[in-house]
Amino acid sequence: MVPQKRSRDDLNGLKSPVRSPKKIAMPAATSASNGVVAGWHSTIEKVVKSVVSIQFAQVASFDCESAVVSEATGFVVDTEMGIIMTNRHVVGAGPFCGYAVFDNHEECELVPIYRDPVHDFGFLKFDPSKIKYMNVQKLRLCPEKAQVGTEIRVVGNDNGEKLSILSGFISRLDRNAPDYGDLTYNDFNTEYIQAAASASGGSSGSPVVDIDGDAIALQAGGSTDASTDFFLPLNRGKRALECILRGDKVTRGTIQTHWMLKPFDECRRLGLSASNEKKQRELFPSTIGMLVAETVLPEGPSAVAATEGDILLSVNSTPISSFITLDSILDEAVGDIVKVTVERNGAEITFDIYVQDLHSITPDRYVEVCGASFQDLSYQLARIYAIPVRGVYVSEVGGSFRLDGQGNESKGWVVDSIDDIDTPDLDTFIKVIAAIPDGRRVSIRYRHLRDLHTTNFTITYIDRKWHSSFRLAVRNDTTGKWDFTDLSKQYPVPKKDEIVPQRATFTDPNLEEADAACAPLSRSFVRVSCMIPYKIDGFPRTMRQSHGLVVDAEKGLVLVSRSIIPYDLCNVSVTFAESVVVPGTVVFMHPLQNYAILQYDPKLVHADIETAKLSSTPLKQGDPVLFMGHNLSLRLVTTRTKVSDVTAITIPPNAGEPYYRALNLDAITVDSTIPNGCTAGVLADPKTGVVRAFWLSCMGERTEGRQHEYRLGIDTSTFLETVQRIRAGKPPQERFLDVEIASVSMIQARIRGVSPEWIAAVEQDNSQRHQLFEVIRTATPINGNSQALKEGDILLSINGKLLTTLTTLSEAGDKEQVTIKLVRNKKEEEIQAPTTDSAFETSQAVFWCGAVLQTPHHAVRQQIKKIHSGVYVSSRAQGSPAYQYLIAPTNFITHVNGTATPDLETFLSVVTKIPDNTYVKLRIVTFDNVAFACSMKMNYHYFPTAEIKKEGNEWVGYSYKDGKRVKESDENVEEQVNEAEKQE
């Protein structure tokens, strides 16, 4: 598996030097005889026929593993049943999809049949009859042949290469399991074998073979800072394979105690008596230490008897010198009582301990609800943090459960209660969440495993509109898949008019007497929260919040930044006085100038909300204003300041993935640093309290993992007409020139061919700023026609009006066609340029094999010269076929199986006829115009085809079953309503 190299590899995080006993003579590779070389040659010829490359996806985050696509190695251990051995961290604890590629490049689907709860091995199954052109060989498992000094070969897919053969010598047999860190899978209670073979990512699961071609260990991990590799002994893997071949259950026992192999000198310091040390050394002369209890889990079988620091002497009167012996006893004693003898502080103590079934504390199910997934807390995670094996663990945050606000942690959360009801286990959690109606706001109490001392509380919105899936996934070891059970029928019957009007009171700002006219503005601010269920239009966030300005309290109209409301496929809530929350809807989104208008139901809020008065007079440099806004702590701040500049700005586009940005905008900046710490606010006339500008945040480019945002003011004259039209019940119907322009100084204009007469006219028209504008970027038209304007054009006038301000450009854009005078290639021309209707926001998204597809949105057309297809990849899910087969965001899918797909409807008509678990050929063109072909395997079980489409003002969902389009209706809800009516 590619990410298998870790830096932490010892219990204390330090690197242990590779030392061989002095009595062992390590032969140099250059001194090998011709016979040895020939022996290795024939060995490798045999071994490679059993080694496979595993291309796999862990399709859902579960337990310690996140959803991931990777590659690893495995080797055949049984040719009749078709069993391949590999690592447990490859098979994974959760859903697995993968295939094996044999040495002759034949391919075969893999099905997981066993993953060990603790140790790093697992088994996959393939159909031997599918391999037609190769005589598949199996490797014998011979763990007893692993000895210090044994020359070995690691045969696998090192660094993702098809076949690599690495050589080395075993240097240690008694190493503790490597420590890979917290919140991730770790092996424990086993010895590891150490060697220096310099293996890297992709070699996980490789067989470690001796010169006889026998597998003596399993490659598992290594150190990133050295050439040291860690191999898992095959003793327990061999026993598990024998159970599987016999058709028996692989029993695994535990007493919930983590043991560590500690050297005798350390054991003496922990209380080991001289007599017991002598006895141990006589019984096991080759051992260097004893097993010591490192962690005893609370509420586990050992909790009442064992304690940390206990030195293990025997189990059921059998002296213990290794983990292998301990595992053997416990695995055969599941459900029984064992007698454990330890030495504690120099005294021998014997106690009885119940042996628990290890599989019973290894989760094999999870529930998906409200966009997140949950499971029972696992033994793996409980051991790391020494806590009881109980509780509800969040496998994947998302939707209504975005618990990553604390330090941006995406995993490691444990939910203690929902709606003030404790959730000690998954079954209780399902009952509690099923009883909560859609749209209800409930409290959540939760903690993070890294900081269990801190209890967190939050209020969440239960969203089943966008995240309607409520299903239980249970592992099926017969089929290798996870079976889904729909739980949505457990939802309560929806109630109408559940939102009750509530009262809120605003706090008064502490203003000087001279600014008292601005005090009512504090009651014009509301907090706007936007939860984004699906990533479309390239927008990089899933949740945004800031403040908006109430521009009509009677109609419930709120002005807000488009960096908060990127599109209307979202859940919007409006909060008044940090007391009352009501839903909001998107009424209008300006295509260029970074503002949107929302609407809420005024009947739901009883508060003294003020309609902000908007000025029609543009601000000028030097005008005195009062800034009022909310900082990042949601506190209202005010300051007197002056307008320092009003200038046309150019916000850089995001090079990696286009998303909405403000264009052709006059930015207002002020002589104060306080507004820069606020994402929203107003610039008001201190004497009258009239709003002169709206302060907002603009989404900028993303560089080196950092998202840039620009905070500035936009003049009220920019949006006043739009607000007035919406107030009057008229649609805004904004039209605009679909180009990006930037200011040009007079010296640039002269050099590029602007005549002295035009320059004189500019200087007379705009006394504050002598400027013209040039076209720096043209958007690719929706209809495929060519643009009338070209990059480099210097615009002189629009419809006969001199163009020295961006306000003139906005006013002229309302017409379907405008007359423009310009300078092109030093020649003055007059052209007719069509304008673009703003009603082109994304109205359809298709979910296919983990990819989110849509029509190329406006930001794409602004940055690309040619639209290759109407099927644009907006995002993709981790662990999905789209991710596995390298279908990346910003790609265009132009053909499917040779059929052109110019739009989403054609695409759907083609792909819905393709059977599950078959390959499809795609022609793809990248954003940089590079075309390539690729294949992708369908996986409808975990990634079914679906569609969401805007019909009128509502988004409607569709699913595809057997190639037929089915509208997602509330069938389950209707059944419940009918049943409730019958009962009444």
Swiss-Prot record:
Query: What are its E.C. numbers?
Result: 3.4.21.-
Name its cellular compartments.
Answer: Nucleus
One Gene Ontology BP term is: proteolysis
* Recorded superkingdom: Eukaryota
Q: Name one GO molecular function term.
A: serine-type endopeptidase activity
Query: Does the keyword field hold Cell wall biogenesis/degradation?
Result: no
Q: Which UniProt keywords apply?
A: Apoptosis, Hydrolase, Nucleus, Protease, Repeat, Serine protease
- Principal cellular location given in the protein's record: nucleus
Residues of the PDZ domain: 268-346, 756-826
Region of interest (Serine protease), ranges? 51-241
**InterPro entries for this protein:** PDZ, PDZ-like_dom, PDZ_sf, Peptidase_S1_PA, Peptidase_S1C
**Pfam families for the chain:** PDZ_1, Trypsin_2
Where are the active-site residues found? H89 (charge relay system), D120 (charge relay system), S203 (charge relay system)
Q: Which GO terms describe its cellular component?
A: nucleus
State the similarity comment: Belongs to the peptidase S1C family.
Q: What does this protein do?
A: Nuclear serine protease which mediates apoptosis.
Q: What is this protein called?
A: Pro-apoptotic serine protease NMA111
Q: What is the organism lineage in this UniProt record?
A: Eukaryota, Fungi, Dikarya, Ascomycota, Saccharomycotina
